[in-house]
């Protein structure tokens, strides 16, 4: 069952965000993840418009997604992430 991590974020420091993306991106790929979408252009089709940037990452299954999120390689990126942006990560399991 494919798993998607949806990261919603508000950038606090663009330089730190670039450094975070450079550090974190390879950890996703090393754990079998694939970037599906990254963007900040938002238009509400129904309901309230939320102005957040998003990144959507696909993993083969939820176990691999969780392994990536708790991996030492990604955990090392946490200080950069916290300086770069306010983030929320949500894991979705698809059928």
Stretches with model-predicted labels:
Residues 1-70, 93-95:
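Short S/T/G/P-rich N-terminal loop/turn motif that feeds into the first structured element of a domain
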Residues 62-90:
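C-terminal structural segments of small proteins and small subunits
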């Amino acid at each position: 069952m494919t798993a998607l991590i949806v990261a919603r974020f508000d950038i606090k420091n663009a330089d730190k965000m670039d450094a975070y993306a450079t550090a974190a991106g390879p950890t996703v790929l090393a754990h079998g993840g694939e970037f599906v979408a990254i963007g900040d252009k938002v238009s509400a089709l129904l309901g309230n418009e939320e102005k957040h940037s998003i990144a959507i990452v696909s993993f083969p299954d939820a176990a691999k997604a969780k392994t990536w999120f708790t991996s030492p390689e990604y955990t090392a990126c946490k200080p950069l992430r916290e300086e770069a942006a306010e983030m929320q990560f949500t894991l979705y399991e698809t059928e």
